[in-house]
Regions:
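Lumenal/extracellular ectodomains and adaptor appendage modules
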Residues: 1-193
Length: 193
């Protein structure tokens, strides 16, 4: 599991998010997020990207568009780890930019959970999920589940199913466009490991 957060900060607005989770063998995983954001303060030089990986090995964090200046491993399963991403050039008020976060995940011990989760704290137009499972057999055809949970509830017991997402056998992937999701919810796509 990797958890991506929309921070709800007043220093920027997130208009769209594109998430890709890809594995060829079920053990080595690449998780990437692209966020279109708009600066809402006079100058923005860096951003925190909070994440939670449920595997046991700390991921390798990079970015194609920003400099990763620090990674904070909280070493606490109840807290989010953090990557600090510095823009190549400072953003000015109302300027748009794309934030890129990439995590190379090692699940060789099989401890990670098979889901991608997003916290929505502010209005956003779209969250595009693409989960590519190249290691699945030609006969695999299980649906993934899109579900949500109020942010202030006990997460483990209060997820409600929104819909099932069919597995595309040609691309070996799940793909879903979550349009204008309701604020103050966790949204999660789960699949069979």
């Amino acid at each position: 599991k990797i958890l991506k957060l929309n921070n709800g900060n007043a220093d920027h607005e997130n208009r769209s998010t594109f998430i890709k989770y890809e594995t060829t063998d079920g053990k080595q995983i690449v998780y990437e997020t692209y966020k279109l954001l708009q600066c809402k303060k006079p100058i923005l030089t860096e951003m925190d990207y909070n994440f939670k990986w449920s595997g046991s090995i700390m991921p390798k964090i990079t970015s194609d568009l920003q400099d990763v200046i620090n990674i904070v491993d909280e070493k606490n399963p109840d807290m989010y780890d953090k990557a600090i991403l510095k823009f190549k050039k400072p953003l000015h008020y109302n300027q748009n930019s794309v934030l890129h976060f990439k995590a190379e995940l090692d699940d060789v011990d099989g401890k990670s959970l098979p889901h991608v989760e997003t916290r929505v704290t502010d209005e956003i137009d779209i969250i595009h999920y693409r989960i590519i499972l190249k290691h699945k057999s030609e006969t695999y055809d299980k649906n993934a589940i899109l579900e949500r949970c109020k942010m202030n509830s006990n997460m483990s017991s209060n997820f409600e199913k929104i819909k099932e997402i069919a597995f595309d056998k040609n691309t070996k992937s799940y793909e879903y466009h979550l349009l204008n999701p309701e604020v103050q919810y966790y949204y999660r796509i789960t699949w069979e490991k």
